């Protein structure tokens, strides 16, 4: 299904949607995500793409960069805060091509990337998503 060329959500819209997704989580998860920065970029950088072995900038919709909480220590200092980046153009393309609700898409990608903050791998996240779909 291809969506008509509706005005795409702005970066500010997407940032609000992602923040709302985080706020929808139970409090103990929100507390652990309090220092995670959410960034909206048009596309991933070459360095970001290379870090996850993805060739095309159109194929990456979100990325977690940072140390998962199970690898953090109270003695860590000088680290940048963890970042969840959402890539606007690939997300808009997926929204237009699939017809999925844009808010649901942002929620899905944001929560997926937040899962990496808790130490979950892509395989772990996909297994949880599949299990949730079968409930």
What are these regions (language model features)?
Residues 1-105, 117, 121-124, 134-135:
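Active-site rim/adjacent substrate-binding subdomains
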Residues 109, 113-117:
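Catalytic glutamate of the conserved HExxH
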Residues 127-128:
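Short, glycine/acidic-rich hinge or "gate" loops at secondary-structure transitions
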Residues 131:
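Extracytoplasmic/periplasmic copper-protein system
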């Amino acid at each position: 299904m291809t969506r008509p060329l509706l005005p795409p959500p702005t970066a500010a819209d997407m940032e609000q949607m992602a923040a709302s997704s985080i706020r929808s989580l139970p409090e103990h998860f929100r507390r652990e995500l309090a220092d995670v920065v959410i960034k909206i970029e048009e596309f991933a950088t070459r360095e970001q793409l290379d870090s996850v072995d993805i060739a095309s900038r159109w194929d990456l919709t979100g990325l977690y960069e940072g140390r998962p909480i199970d690898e953090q220590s109270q003695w860590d200092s000088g680290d940048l805060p963890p970042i969840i980046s959402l890539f606007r153009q690939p997300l808009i393309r997926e929204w237009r091509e699939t017809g999925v609700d844009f808010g649901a898409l942002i929620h899905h990608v944001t929560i997926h990337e937040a899962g990496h903050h808790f130490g979950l791998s892509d395989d772990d996240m996909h297994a949880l998503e599949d299990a949730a779909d079968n409930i």
